């Protein structure tokens, strides 16, 4: 009864107006699952390949009809007849069918759509919420949201090199409270920026995209917004950034155009360290470039005991690359993006490896998103503890937050909010003194 009987795919649009793929998998029982695949702007060079058509006369080359055809053709032929409850078998079938290291033949977007839609169909067949199907009876941890409230870099047309400035409501008692604290701070920040004559248009992920004098000014605005919202910077709301340093790394140097500075990896580490001393900055993603493994080692040695150092571009959700990072003492956390690796099984393997090595995990969206909220269920199902899914506006971001509210309601008293735990993991007490906070 849980046998796959049909697979369908279509081309839809993501939050940037670019095509992406949506897949539906139907079972013999009549149950079905649907999944839409996101797309990134700043991408790691070793990510699994997102298959695009390349026809400049259609969607400027970004169409995904080839991926759709692959799903409707040889992928459907290979998976029809498989049991949707056997996710590992299904994903291995996809991997064998593609036969390449980076999924370039069938496309990671095509494969992931089938993989996730199958999981949804299976959970529907069993009558289980998706988070419980993915994680079992112990799925109970509501993640701390890393809320992107100022955008820069590849996500916004402004002069900030750092791609994301985020807030983490670590002092909240529940996810519901965390969401409220973040929303209040977001609206306060908007008012502060507008009062000073800054534009309050938003970037790809819903954060504001002002032209500021410096990155330091961005931190000042955010800490002021936290305070004027009635919260304590650090104790109740901490800060996080995604530097996306690969985007401004050239010829072995870090070129910060907005700052008018060029840094070596040691100088870049020192610059980031200054912010952690000055502000309650407890999480840095992609502080150095993906190819700068030597620099990452130094960054981890100098800041890794007290700051969460999240590897995104350097690890690309790949268990083999993560294993190398663990062996070499690089980073202490990994960003998890489903479309970087291309199947649910490989994603779960990467999360398990990270947990075994005491690396924290952050489940993440992409800058080109859809209304699909699979990652919200994944974050709770795997007790990941953290989720990064944009700002407090744009329905493609809020879809994930609203799903987490529903999950928290469903869990009732069994749900645990991860805020205090992520702080204690890095020895952060919340009462530290900072120069400007």
UniProtKB/Swiss-Prot annotation:
Listed EC numbers: 4.2.1.11
Compartment(s) where it occurs, according to its Swiss-Prot or TrEMBL record: Cytoplasm; Secreted; Cell surface
Swiss-Prot/TrEMBL catalytic activity: (2R)-2-phosphoglycerate = phosphoenolpyruvate + H2O
Keyword tRNA-binding listed: no
Entry GO CC: cell surface; extracellular region; phosphopyruvate hydratase complex
Disulfide bonds: none
Enzyme superclass (EC): lyase
Residues binding (2R)-2-phosphoglycerate, per UniProt: 163, 337, 366-367, 388
UniProt-annotated binding residues for Mg(2+): 242, 285, 312
Location (main, coarse): cytoplasm
Pathway info: Carbohydrate degradation; glycolysis; pyruvate from D-glyceraldehyde 3-phosphate: step 4/5
A Pfam cross-reference name: Enolase_N
MF term (GO), any: phosphopyruvate hydratase activity
Active site: 205, 337
Keyword entries, A-Z: Cytoplasm, Glycolysis, Lyase, Magnesium, Metal-binding, Secreted
Names of the cofactor(s): Mg(2+)
GO biological-process terms attached to the record: glycolytic process
InterPro entries referenced in this protein's UniProt entry, alphabetically: Enolase, Enolase-like_C_sf, Enolase-like_N, Enolase_C, Enolase_CS, Enolase_N
NCBIfam families hit by this protein: eno
HAMAP family in the record: Enolase
Record family assignment: Belongs to the enolase family.
Role description: Catalyzes the reversible conversion of 2-phosphoglycerate (2-PG) into phosphoenolpyruvate (PEP). It is essential for the degradation of carbohydrates via glycolysis.
PANTHER family: ENOLASE
Protein known as: Enolase
Organism: Nitratidesulfovibrio vulgaris (strain ATCC 29579 / DSM 644 / CCUG 34227 / NCIMB 8303 / VKM B-1760 / Hildenborough) (Desulfovibrio vulgaris)
Lineage of producing organism: Bacteria, Pseudomonadati, Thermodesulfobacteriota, Desulfovibrionia, Desulfovibrionales
Gene that encodes the chain: eno
